[in-house]
A protein has these predicted regions:
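Short, isolated positions in well-ordered beta-strands
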Residues: 14-15, 29
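Short, surface-exposed charged micro-motifs
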Residues: 12-14, 88
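Short glycine/proline-enriched coil/turn segments at helix->beta-strand junctions
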Residues: 3-5, 83-86
Length: 103
């Protein structure tokens, strides 16, 4: 990462790369491992689209459970947790998702 940058940020959501922890508005946001993996992939590329298949590949690796439908479930759970924070996951039908901070 450029300039020893050890955190990624999207609005009030911050991801500390050293201890692999999210915080939202200064509060630690604890997530189940697969939700964490989804959000970790989205915050690495704020504003850039990731397809369901890309996310499934990253989240599940070679795991047989890998299903794009499961990604939808994690996205909806994450949306609930981010609700009202000014950070949101936007769906582009048939294309994928991106993370953005509301202006």
């Amino acid at each position: 990462l450029m300039g020893g940058e050890r955190q990624q940020q999207c609005g009030e959501l911050i991801y500390d790369l050293n201890d692999r922890r999210f915080s939202l508005r200064g509060e630690v946001l604890t997530l189940p491992s697969r939700e964490h993996a989804v959000l970790e992939n989205l915050i690495a590329r704020p504003g850039r689209l990731m397809s369901k298949e890309q996310l499934a590949g990253k989240v599940f690796g070679l795991d047989q459970d890998a299903s794009p439908e499961a990604i939808e479930i994690y996205i909806s759970r994450l949306r609930r947790k981010l609700d009202g924070s000014g950070v949101r996951i936007v769906t582009f039908r048939g294309l994928g998702y991106l993370l953005e901070a509301e202006a």
